[in-house]
Each structure stands twice: as C-alpha cells, then as structure tokens.
Amino acid sequence: MFNVTKKSIEWGGETLTLETGKVARQADGSVIATLGETSVMANVTFAKAAKPGQDFFPLTVHYQERYYAAGKVPGGFFKREARPSEKETLTSRLIDRPIRPLFVDGFKNEVLLIVTVLSHDLVNEPDIVAMIAASAALTISGVPFMGPIGAARVGFAGGEYVLNPDVDDMQKLRENPEQRLDLVIAGTKDAVMMVESEAYELSEAEMLGAVKFGHEAMQPVIDMIIDFAEEAAHEPFDFSPPDYAALYAKVKSLGETQMRAAFAIREKQDRVNAIDAARAAIKAQLSEAELADENLGTAFKKLESSILRGDIINGGARIDGRDTKTVRPIISETSVLPRTHGSALFTRGETQALVVTTLGTGEDEQIIDALHGNSRSNFLLHYNFPPYSVGEVGRFGPPGRREIGHGKLAWRALQAVLPAATDFPYTIRVVSEITESNGSSSMASVCGGSLSMMDAGVPLKAPVAGVAMGLILEDDGKWAVLTDILGDEDHLGDMDFKVAGTENGITSLQMDIKVAGITPEIMEQALAQAKDGRMHILGEMSKALSSANSFSAYAPKIETLTIPTDKIREVIGSGGKVIREIVETSGAKVDINDDGVIKIASNDQAAIKKAYDMIWSIVAEPEEGQIYTGKVVKLVDFGAFVNFFGKRDGLVHVSQIANKRLTHPNEVLKEGQEVKVKLLGFDERGKVRLGMKMVDQETGQEIQPEKKEKEEAGEA
C-alpha cells in the first residue's frame, strides 16, 4: 500500500531523516523531515496551467506550528490554533525567500507550499527542519524548481562557530555574552541564496566567516536531498520557458529612447510618471495580440532592467546621479512630537521614517506563547508601511507579512544595544511610521529607532545605523556593489543586502540573492562598502543626538527592589488583598516577578515612595537597637502591646514604659496612642521585646545616660 522512501544522515550531532510515500500521497510532493525528535511535514501542490493573463509567479508559503507537537493545548476560548503568530509569519518568509528565485523564469503556475510542525523536542529549532523539508518536497514534486537548497543555523560562542545551536542557546542569546550570533543561512550547492541574522557587534570578517561556515555545513544535506530525489522524484512537469524575444525586440525598438530619458529623471515621482508614459506610448503602437501577450510585462521589465543595469556596469551614474558608494543626503531630527516619550524623524533622500518610542511598565511586556513555552519580551518594534509612502492607492489594514518581517529586522538590529533589564526596568515600544519610501525603509527604521530611543532617555550601549546594499551582476562576470539602494535598484538588481550595526560591529545582517554566482569576493566587498556607509550615517545621526536625553516628563518613573522569594506571598496577601491595598493607597503600579524583583511605577515620585515604604515595611526585618514609631493596640496589667514596623507587634513591659514605677500602663498610655519604641531584643519564643523609657517621646531620639540619671534623680 505504501511505497516509502527514507534516507538518513548524521548532521550536527543529530540524525536527520527524510521520508516520503506514506503520508499525504495525493500532494505533488510530500516529505517529513526529522532532526532529533523534531519532525516537520512539507506538502507541495501546483496548478498544471497558469491563469490566463497572469503576469507574475503566484507562490504561497504557509508555515504552521501545531501545539500538539510539544504536548500543549492552545490557549484562548476556542482552544485551537488561529491566525498565524509572528514566529509562523517570519518562518514562512524564511522558507519563501531562498526558494522563490529558483523557479524557472516564466513559470507562472500557482504553487502552494504548506509546512507543518508535527513534533518538537524543544532542542532542535523547527525552522531549519522546515526549510529542509520544503526543499526536499519541491525537489521531488516535479515542479520546475532549480534546487535543492540546504539550510543551517550558525552560532558563535567562545570564538568558534557552532552548527545548529539548540533552542536554549538561542533563547538565552541576549543574556549570554559568550553566545553572540544567531544566523540562518540557505543556499544551493554552489551559491548562498539567503541569510538572516542577529548578532552582538561582530566584525565583518566574523560575519563573512559565519556565512562560509554555514554554506559548507549544509552541503551534506543538499547531497542527501539529491540522493533522496533520485529514488522518490515524480516525473518532471512539462514546461518550456516562453520565448518572448520578438516581443522584447519590438518593445525595445519602439520605446528605448523614451524609456532612457525617463530613467534619467532623478526625482522618484517624476521618474515613475515618465516611465508610465513611456510604457503607454509603447503599448499604443502594439497590436491587440501583442497587448494580450502575458509576457508583455516581462518584456517591459527586461528593457527597464537593461537600461538601469547597463548604465551602472559601464561606469555611468545611477538613476539619481550618485556613484556606487555614495549615501543619499541625510537629515536627522529628534523631539519632533511634544507629548511622546521620544521621537525622531529620519530622512535619507526620498526615504523617511517617523519613529516614536514609548516607555511602559512590566505589565506592558508582550507575552509570547510558543511551542517551547511562554516568555515575555520587554522590547517591541512595530513597522507600518501605508500606501501614501509611495504615492499610491492600496490596501490599508493590519500589518502584512512584509511589515512584520521588516519590523523584526529592525528589532534584531537594535536589541543588541539595549541596556539590561536590571539597569533599565522599562518596557520599550518603538513604532516606525514610514512616511516616504524609495528603498531601504527598514534601515531608516533602524536609524530612526536608535535616535528615538535615545531621545526617550534609553541608555543604549551605542547608536545603531543600517544601510541597504545592492548588486548588479552580469553574465559576462562584470559586477558592481551599490551602497544605499533605491527602490528601482532593489527591484531590478540581483541582491538585497541589509547591514546594521554600531561603530564596533554588526548587529544584524539580512541578505536575499536572486542569482547564482555570488562569490566570497563580492560579499567581502559588499560588507566593506556597508561598513563605510554605516560609519557615514552614524556621523550624520550624531549631529542630531549622540547620547541619551533626560527622561520625558510624561514617561513613568520606575524603581525596583528585590525581596526574598519567600516574602512574595506576604506582599501579595490572601487573594491579592495586600497588593491591592498598596496600589490603591499609593496610586502606583506594582509588578512582582517570581524571582522577587518588584517594579514600582508612577508619574508621581511620591506615589512610588509610598508604595516602596509599604512594601519594605512588610518584608524588612526589624533590627535590634533601632527606634521605631508605633501605635498602642492593647493595654494589659503587665505592659502594652505596640504595633510597629508595618504589621509587627511587640510588648513593652510595664517596667520599660517610664522612668518611674507604674502600677498599670494606663497611668501614662491609652490605646491608639502613637509612641516611640526601641527594639530591645527577642525572648526565647521569638517574641519582640520593646522599650519606651530610653526614648525621648518628642524627638524620637535615644536619651543619653546622663540625662536619664537626672530624670531618675528628679523622680526620686
């Protein structure tokens, strides 16, 4: 009944297995990949014909994590998986980016790739396994896919590269100074296709070394998929790339001159309008059959690409007049919004980001529910890209995959320089509103985010800047690396290479490559140019702000104290009674962690002090010999019970009340009276012994021996 194909190798200290032929047999390609005890299933289906008139490649990738994979039940009212989490969205993009360029040019049939996590051992991250499963499923499906690809995760600990560090290592990346890198790489046997990384100020050489290490480490996986496909692959889909040479030749002859003139215009919107006019002029001269040709859009793109790329490769200027290494003009401003905690407006050429920072308390932290368990994040970065930023009318609504991905890239770039939570106990939310875009808006978010946080008073370890690099690589081997690319250079170029970091090193690197043939020499040149660009941008940013400002008057103030964990119950009280009383009485917010760290927040410093004192009176131990203010709560024949130091009671013996003989305490005291008492010690049962006669009841100071003797003599 089943025709099972199964292959296994030892890889990175674990067994990697690929299996097909038993599950999801009606899919065009189905593979279950297992690393350790983490199993991921990838299923590929594709349409056998393109939709009429379709001029793009409709590839859809869905990565989904099932809670049962880790033995968990989903939260929420319905107790089932719902909309994709941020992790699922980011992993979908991680799979999509390296495979999309490897489909044969001209293939426009719809392709659907669904990747599902079936089992998670809480050791091996499922994203790498998912990419391997997806690659294998595509390779055996028969779809015109020029893979396979491999994938690997690279860490950097103790000066050594580490293959596929486990979940715990990556979760503790920020707290562990030895573990300084989380890099995911995907590529074919001969070329790197995609890099995504989070780093802690690594040098360009260290980052390049990590890419080389990862590409070499994935080779056994690629060889395994090839061997696997030789036994399990379906018949290749009969597809021949469309021949549109005649159509392209006609488009070029009709409109190359006008199109070149359009690309010579330096302002983006004027250039876009001129390009649209050139296209319209060409279309006006084409026949109905040529206008209906689904390859017309491809012919236009080829013409535009040849103009932009040819001018750069042949030593001419870029479309905005710059050479290959120049960064566009930069203007940085801070404190642009009066009531926010921190704000910055970062403008680089025709790309602009308005970035706002808000400081919150512990209750504002984001709770992340993942397969490996719940966690909390005190740093949030949200990126918004409205249609008006590119002068268009378009969809407006919740953030899409692109916005989530760009926001996470900026998050990775900035989180490496955040102060430790123990030093800066705030939740930080950064929002980047892209108000203009002509390339590299995510890197503008990094620059604006750094300035905005410093404007809010966040003591960053160092300012961070980012720059997007591009590449033009021709078939004859000529190439050019471009600094600070425009939108058209990204669209028509061969590489999008984003690098962010401080003066000391790289904090984030993202690379997407559309062609094979990217050599280590090209990558080294791109990193060197990116460093020069980053240093220039940091210099321009420092003109606006070079270090953290003082706190905004509108930001909450936070103080922390640490109490013994066995005292947490006393501070909370039965059913939360005590903590509610503290909050209501003081007016401050109080957040208690399981480790005994308490954060007290308010805009009013007096409220913070009130809450602090109330908590301290509960958890602190009274010290022998110290003087405290108390209240008489009960009088008995042998003395007075006094409540002091919060909820504590002690006995003042009748002989310790006054410097004279008393027959009953009510001769000098009454219930409810405020008194000053000295803690004399503890009896054999641990009961508190207090004294009054050695304390001046007016000043609260201890009576000196000579004064005491005079008082006793006077009484005699």
Swiss-Prot record:
PROSITE patterns: KH_TYPE_1 (PS50084), S1 (PS50126)
Binding residues annotated for Mg(2+), in chain numbering: 490, 496
Keyword Coiled coil: no
Cysteines joined through disulfide linkages: none
Positions with biased composition (Basic and acidic residues): 704-716
Protein name per the record: Polyribonucleotide nucleotidyltransferase
Key words, A-Z: Cytoplasm, Magnesium, Metal-binding, Nucleotidyltransferase, RNA-binding, Transferase
SUPFAM superfamilies for this protein: Eukaryotic type KH-domain (KH-domain type I) (SSF54791), Nucleic acid-binding proteins (SSF50249), Polynucleotide phosphorylase/guanosine pentaphosphate synthase (PNPase/GPSI), domain 3 (SSF46915), Ribonuclease PH domain 2-like (SSF55666), Ribosomal protein S5 domain 2-like (SSF54211)
PANTHER family: POLYRIBONUCLEOTIDE NUCLEOTIDYLTRANSFERASE, POLYRIBONUCLEOTIDE NUCLEOTIDYLTRANSFERASE 1, MITOCHONDRIAL
Reaction equation(s) it catalyzes: RNA(n+1) + phosphate = RNA(n) + a ribonucleoside 5'-diphosphate
Source organism (scientific name): Cereibacter sphaeroides (strain ATCC 17023 / DSM 158 / JCM 6121 / CCUG 31486 / LMG 2827 / NBRC 12203 / NCIMB 8253 / ATH 2.4.1.)
Chief subcellular location: cytoplasm
Cellular component GO terms held in the UniProt record: cytosol
